[in-house]
Amino acid sequence: MLAVFLQGFALSAAMILPLGPQNAFVMNQGIKRQHHLMSASLCALSDIILICAGIFGGSALLNRSPLLLALVTWGGVAFLLWYGWGALMAAWRGDSSSAAVAAGTQGRWRIIVTLLAVTWLNPHVYLDTFVVLGSLGGQLLPDVRPWFAFGAVSASVAWFFALALLAAWLSPWLNRPGSQRVINLLVGGVMWFIAFQLARQGLNL
């Protein structure tokens, strides 16, 4: 059981750790010290739902529909290109806040809506949870499959809360204009890199 748990934990961590829209959003809220723990909680809850759905049946549905998989892939390409463009433009203009959210103080509900959009309207999330985690978890025996899901979920929860708390702790340094420009450049570059990788996968479908 422990080996299966660690397998799920390691695989989930490998996909979550690279910078993506969710990470950029949570990091930005941590830097601003604005509802950062709530943001981490919503990201973790969304991942729990998506990971469990992928491992316990959603992956088979996606894999049986090449058209749906293609739509998810190319939707992810478009989303990531748009998101990366916003980050690069923020870096070019020298905005003092990350492109993950608009500048200025936001209300709790606006943060919730933005975070849900960043998570649930990002098709790359479905590729990670349904195609990768779902395909591998779905091949396991039914009695050990929950342990794989538990490991994957644990990695997600631990990462988002660690990221939010670390960003809040480093806020005095990361909230400077120069640091924000570097962050925006990094976010934009990574988003476009992931988009081009997804496009290559889409051409091979």
Swiss-Prot record:
Q: Does the keyword Cell inner membrane apply?
A: yes
Gene Ontology terms, MF aspect: L-arginine transmembrane transporter activity
Where does the UniProt annotation locate this protein?
Cell inner membrane
Q: Reaction(s) catalyzed by this protein?
A: L-arginine(in) = L-arginine(out)
Can you list the GO cellular component terms from the UniProt entry? plasma membrane
Which family does the similarity line name? Belongs to the LysE/ArgO transporter (TC 2.A.75) family.
Give the protein name, as stated in the record.
Answer: Arginine exporter protein ArgO
The species this protein was found in? Yersinia enterocolitica serotype O:8 / biotype 1B (strain NCTC 13174 / 8081)
